[in-house]
């Protein structure tokens, strides 16, 4: 499979971001609103990245660069809450890995 490490990283990031957003929503805290928004955006961008890469789209590289930006922003926001919430810590770690894989692809 083409860029299988990047696709696996995007899939893991999609799942971690969805889980983090869901857990943050359950906390009902205004402090987490940006985290929720970035996690949801990052998950969608990761999903798009996977789809475009699998069909060898001419836009795949552009979306991978957007994925790097989105994962980096999401990781930075999740890290603000990482000391108190495992789902935020895990999401930040997975986002950093995904950004690295997309950058390398």
Kindly give the residue locations of the regions a language model identified.
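Amphipathic alpha-helical hairpins
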Residues: 1-105
């Amino acid at each position: 499979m083409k860029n299988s490490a990047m696709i696996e990283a995007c899939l893991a990031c999609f799942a971690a971001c969805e889980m983090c957003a869901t857990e943050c929503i359950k906390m009902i805290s205004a402090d987490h609103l940006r985290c929720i928004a970035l996690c949801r955006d990052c998950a969608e961008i990761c999903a798009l990245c996977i789809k475009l890469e699998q069909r060898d789209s001419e836009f795949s590289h552009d979306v991978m660069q957007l994925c790097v930006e989105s994962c980096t922003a999401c990781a930075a926001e999740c890290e603000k809450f990482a000391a108190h919430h495992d789902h935020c810590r895990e999401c930040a770690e997975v986002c950093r890995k995904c950004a690295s894989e997309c950058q390398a692809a």
